[in-house]
């Protein structure tokens, strides 16, 4: 990894809560100064920011990164068939080496498309932590616990999470954080859910869970418990400001009140929800109710990539057509979802370009045909940009990508290893 301790991004268009032209000085892992008076002698490394939009690194709040190995598996199936007949049988063959290879490939893809932080739930997470440490990205990692209402399995799952906390939490200079990650109300017993929250509270960790992804899930729980998923989770004290609920597609007005009151964050996954025909999450309604909504890609096999630029555009367009109102979810609100809202959900001091924030920064090339003319840089980022327009990525003050070249990952090796790993599944 680069030894650079100071970086100057010179004369660039900065996109954060407002648009301005200035230079940015990074010292160690922090944005030290934003000014027009900075000189090339102020830093040991200077990056030319002209013809670039400089923006916060994107925050992917729901992923299963090692599922890169399952790209193209189970296409065109609805969720339960997709899980039961395609995904879970292949996941049963996973081991440490395969998860590491899949994670490394995902890091390469995420860095090259401007993601600097991701919130992940999967298996063999120590291997993903290792890939995070090596690649320089930032990850919140949870072991996906599923007990299928079996007592012995519950004990094993809690033990696995405790081991992950012990081995990986707050490692890699703080870039690896651990979350407690019970999979979903329909795969986890009440006891596992309760123990998960106690564990999260004890260690002051985030709790990451799938909730109300499909109508079937909601209907089944209502039949069993006479409660909707969020009502059920609230009844066992699972909801608070440290809860990140992935999907939240089928949410009632009463649940909206609960989510606002408990300050729960929602991770919206538009590509996945569309591909699996799960439904359209009521994002504009969440925002009207002052609920923090961020964006996630979900796993590659229900997307089928990790490009957060695609997710931003889909998020905006889907809400506009769903409400039949073109003014719904304007570009700034969408941008905030993929940056500062995600950072808020994860409790990380990033998501905007301001002095004192962590230096997680992406430079996007404006000088390409589909970005010209640049009348409004914000509009271009949401509606025109592609992940492949990312030119430079800095995370925690370290250069991870420069001139589109990965600096911390050998891309050829990552691709080769992932191809071999995928063959074993």
Curated annotation (Swiss-Prot):
An MF annotation (GO) of this entry: adenosine deaminase activity
Endpoints of the signal sequence: none
EC number(s) stated in the UniProt entry for this protein: 3.5.4.41, 3.5.4.31, 3.5.4.4, 3.5.4.28
Cofactor binding, note field: Binds 1 zinc ion per subunit.
Highest taxon listed in the record's lineage: Archaea
Residues the record lists as binding Zn(2+): 62, 64, 210, 298
Entries under HAMAP family matching the protein: MTA_SAH_deamin
Quaternary structure and interacting proteins, as annotated: Homotetramer.
Protein role: Catalyzes the deamination of three SAM-derived enzymatic products, namely 5'-deoxyadenosine, S-adenosyl-L-homocysteine, and 5'-methylthioadenosine, to produce the inosine analogs. Can also deaminate adenosine. The preferred substrate for this enzyme is 5'-deoxyadenosine, but all these substrates are efficiently deaminated. Likely functions in a S-adenosyl-L-methionine (SAM) recycling pathway from S-adenosyl-L-homocysteine (SAH) produced from SAM-dependent methylation reactions.
Name of the featured protein: 5'-deoxyadenosine deaminase
Organism: Methanosphaera stadtmanae (strain ATCC 43021 / DSM 3091 / JCM 11832 / MCB-3)
Annotated gene: dadD
């Amino acid at each position: 990894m680069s030894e650079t301790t100071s970086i100057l991004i010179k004369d660039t268009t900065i996109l954060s809560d407002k648009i301005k032209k200035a230079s940015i000085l990074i010292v160690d892992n922090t944005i030290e100064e934003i000014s027009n008076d900075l000189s090339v002698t102020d830093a040991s490394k200077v990056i030319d920011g002209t013809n670039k939009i400089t923006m916060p690194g994107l925050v992917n709040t729901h992923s299963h990164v090692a599922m890169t190995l399952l790209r193209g598996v189970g296409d065109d199936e609805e969720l339960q068939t997709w899980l039961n007949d395609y995904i879970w049988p292949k996941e049963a063959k996973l081991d440490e080496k395969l998860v590491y290879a899949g994670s490394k490939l995902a890091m390469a893809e995420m860095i090259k498309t401007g993601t600097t932080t991701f919130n992940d739930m999967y298996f063999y997470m120590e291997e993903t932590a290792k890939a995070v440490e090596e690649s320089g990205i930032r990850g919140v990692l949870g072991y996906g616990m599923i007990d299928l209402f079996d007592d012995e399995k519950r004990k094993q799952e809690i033990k696995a999470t405790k081991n992950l906390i012990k081995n990986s939490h707050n490692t890699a200079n703080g870039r690896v954080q651990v979350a407690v990650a019970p999979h979903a109300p329909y795969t986890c017993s009440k006891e596992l859910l309760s123990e998960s929250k106690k564990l999260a509270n004890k260690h002051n960790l985030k709790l990451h869970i799938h909730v109300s992804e499909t109508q079937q899930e909601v209907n089944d729980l209502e039949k069993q418990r006479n409660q909707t998923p969020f009502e059920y989770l609230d009844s066992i004290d699972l909801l608070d400001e440290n809860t990140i609920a992935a999907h939240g597609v089928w949410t009632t007005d009463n649940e909206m009140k609960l989510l606002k009151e408990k300050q729960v964050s929602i991770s919206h996954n538009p590509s996945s929800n569309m591909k699996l025909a799960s439904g359209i999450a009521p994002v504009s309604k969440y925002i009207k109710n002052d609920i923090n909504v961020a964006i996630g890609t979900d796993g590659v096999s229900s997307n089928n990539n990790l490009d957060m630029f695609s997710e931003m555009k889909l998020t905006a367009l889907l809400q506009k057509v769903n409400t039949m109102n073109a003014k719904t979810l304007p570009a700034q609100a969408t941008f905030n979802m993929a940056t500062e809202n995600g950072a808020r959900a994860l409790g990380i001091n990033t998501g905007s370009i301001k002095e004192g924030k962590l230096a997680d920064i992406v430079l996007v090339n404006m000088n390409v045909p589909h970005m010209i003319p640049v009348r409004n840089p914000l509009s271009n980022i949401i509606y025109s940009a592609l992940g492949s327009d990312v030119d430079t990525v800095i995370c925690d003050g370290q250069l991870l990508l420069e001139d589109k070249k990965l600096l911390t990952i050998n891309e050829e090796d990552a691709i080769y290893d992932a191809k071999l790993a995928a063959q074993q599944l």
